[in-house]
Regions:
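A generic structured-segment signal
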Residues: 40, 53-54, 85-89, 96-102
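Positively charged n-region of N-terminal signal peptides that target proteins for export
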Residues: 1-5
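Bacterial N-terminal signal peptides
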Residues: 9-19
Length: 124
């Protein structure tokens, strides 16, 4: 009986350790926006957004279609919004009409656009 209790406790400890390592790894691999909170660069990002993205996502990201409404990134993806943005913009989603922008736009430009998008997130 004691041996079974020890095995169960060890299994729980291993499970908790795996979850903690997975959460830490996920957080460690999440990209970091170097311009987050910079109002001037957010304004530049808005202009860049209107130049490169607005034909599908609307001027100033005001697109009513939910799949393309980038004001809802935080609602849809929570803490993973930054990863979803960077991955989608970098690698595209050709099946949904999203082109690959990596190599076309610099990382600096992508982060300025994301900095702008951080300022227009909606709560509903």
């Amino acid at each position: 009986m004691f041996r079974m209790a020890v095995l169960i406790a060890a299994a729980w400890a291993a499970t908790i350790l795996c979850v903690c390592v997975a959460v830490a790894a996920d957080t460690a691999t999440r990209p970091v926006n170097p311009y987050s909170g910079n109002a001037q660069l957010a304004q530049e990002g808005g202009s860049l957004f209107n130049q490169y993205c607005s034909h599908c996502h609307g001027q100033w990201a005001e697109q009513g279609e939910r799949p393309r409404d980038l004001r809802r990134l935080r609602i849809r993806y929570g803490d993973d919004a930054i990863s979803m943005f960077y991955t989608t913009v970098s690698t595209g989603r050709m099946e949904k009409g999203m082109p690959v922008w990596k190599g076309v736009l610099s990382d600096e430009t992508l982060w300025k656009i994301f900095t702008f998008l951080e300022t227009v997130q909606t709560e509903d």
